[in-house]
Each structure stands twice: as structure tokens, then as C-alpha cells.
């Protein structure tokens, strides 16, 4: 697995923990990396994604809500909600990652961690957000 893909996976796991446990960011980071042998570049990118996504939730969540027809954020599967958050953060703030790569990486996470419909769900919402932001 490529380093950036692994970083996204780690960031998703931390976002999931933050969403479920409602624990502080510093505690999640400390507990997550404890006893993990991870290359520094993987860890640094994962932390950047995690911290950046959390910092921008006030702008990310309403954006997702506007494009998730008939879906309330609270009713979404926790994993799908956090894949969307991560994907939107990358779409909007990762200037070195092409939008198609951001969307594809999020869809792959959905296929790996979500249910059989997650990939299509994630793809549809992220694609709509991307098209709207570049219209």
C-alpha cells in the first residue's frame, strides 16, 4: 500500500475515533500512535489530514449536508460520514493532490471500510461538491 494511501487510512481511523469517542484531538493522536511503528512521512501526512479535517468541520459538514440529498449527517454511517469529511478536506485544501485522486482515494476507503453501497454514495457526493466548487 502506498504511503499516502496508508496515511489516509490512519487519518480515517482517527476521525472515526474522534466522532465516536468525542475525545480530544491530542489524546486521540497520542493513543493512536502509541506502540505503532510508522514511517515519519506517513505519520506526518496522516496527522495533517486528521487535524486539518477536524479544524474545518464547521465548513465541511454543511457542505456535505447541502450535497447529500435526503441524508442527515447524524443518520449517515459513521464511517461514511468521516470518509466524506476527509475527502472534502482534501478536495478543498490539498493543492498538491488532483481532485480525481482525492475522490478515488475516498471511494477506495469506502469500498474497504464501508458497506456495498458506500463507494457509490461517497463518489456521488464528492463529485457533486467538486463540480459545484469548480463551476
Residue ranges and their predicted role:
Residues 1-135:
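N-terminal interaction/assembly modules
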Amino acid at each position: 500500500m502506498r504511503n499516502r494511501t496508508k496515511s489516509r487510512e490512519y487519518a480515517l481511523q482517527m476521525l472515526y475515533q474522534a466522532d465516536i469517542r468525542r475525545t480530544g484531538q491530542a489524546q486521540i493522536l497520542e493513543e493512536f500512535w502509541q506502540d505503532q511503528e510508522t514511517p515519519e512521512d506517513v505519520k506526518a501526512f496522516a496527522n495533517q489530514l486528521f487535524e486539518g479535517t477536524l479544524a474545518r468541520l464547521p465548513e465541511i459538514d454543511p457542505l456535505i449536508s447541502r450535497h447529500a440529498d435526503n441524508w442527515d449527517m447524524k443518520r449517515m454511517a459513521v464511517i461514511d460520514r468521516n470518509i466524506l469529511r476527509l475527502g472534502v478536506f482534501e478536495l478543498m485544501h490539498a493543492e498538491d493532490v488532483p481532485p480525481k485522486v482525492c475522490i478515488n482515494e475516498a471511494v477506495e476507503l469506502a469500498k474497504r471500510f464501508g458497506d456495498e453501497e458506500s463507494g457509490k454514495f461517497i463518489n456521488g457526493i464528492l463529485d457533486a461538491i467538486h463540480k459545484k466548487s469548480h463551476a
